[in-house]
Each structure stands twice: as structure tokens, then as C-alpha cells.
From Swiss-Prot:
Designated name of the protein: Endoregulin
Described function: Inhibits the activity of the calcium ATPases ATP2A2/SERCA2 and ATP2A3/SERCA3 by decreasing their apparent affinity for Ca(2+).
Species this protein is from: Mus musculus (Mouse)
Record keywords: Endoplasmic reticulum, Membrane, Transmembrane, Transmembrane helix
Membrane topology classification: Single-pass membrane protein
Tissue specificity statement from the Swiss-Prot or TrEMBL entry: Largely expressed in non-muscle tissues with the exception of weak expression in body wall muscles at 14.5 dpc. Expressed in epithelial cells of the trachea, bronchus, lung, intestine, pancreas, and liver.
Subunit structure, as described in the record: Homooligomer. Can also form heterooligomers with other sarcoplasmic/endoplasmic reticulum calcium ATPase (SERCA) regulators ARLN, PLN, SLN and STRIT1/DWORF. Monomer. Interacts as a monomer with ATP2A2/SERCA2; the interaction results in inhibition of ATP2A2 Ca(2+) affinity.
Keyword match Endoplasmic reticulum: yes
GO cellular component terms, semicolon-separated: endoplasmic reticulum membrane
Paired cysteines (S-S): none
Keyword flag Membrane: yes
Subcellular location(s) of the protein: Endoplasmic reticulum membrane
Length: 56
């Protein structure tokens, strides 16, 4: 009979055990979220200024 192959983990355990990899991923995530937050503020305040000028 055939042998069952043990299921492989989706996440590599070696990656999560290395603090440099986790730290690098954290920094990349923070930069990305900060950039998206700046874009969101630019869009929101840009539209607010346009709406104020149109009312006057």
C-alpha cells in the first residue's frame, strides 16, 4: 500500500523563528501602511479644500 505524505505547513517555521526576518517584515508593513495613510489624508483633505472653494 502507498504511504501517506505528511501535510506540509503553509508557513515556514524557520522564517518566523528568525527575529531579523520578522523585524524586516514589520518595517516593510509599517512603511506600507504609513504611505497608504498619507495617500488617504491627501485625498480626504484635497476634496475638503475643493468643496470649500466651490461653496464660496
Amino acid at each position: 500500500m502507498g504511504q501517506m505524505v505528511p501535510p506540509r505547513s503553509i508557513q515556514n517555521e524557520d522564517f518566523w523563528k528568525n527575529p531579523w526576518d520578522v523585524g524586516g517584515l514589520t518595517v516593510i508593513g509599517l512603511f506600507t501602511s504609513t504611505f497608504l495613510l498619507f495617500v488617504l489624508f491627501a485625498v480626504v483633505f484635497g476634496y475638503v479644500e475643493k468643496a470649500v472653494f466651490e461653496e464660496e
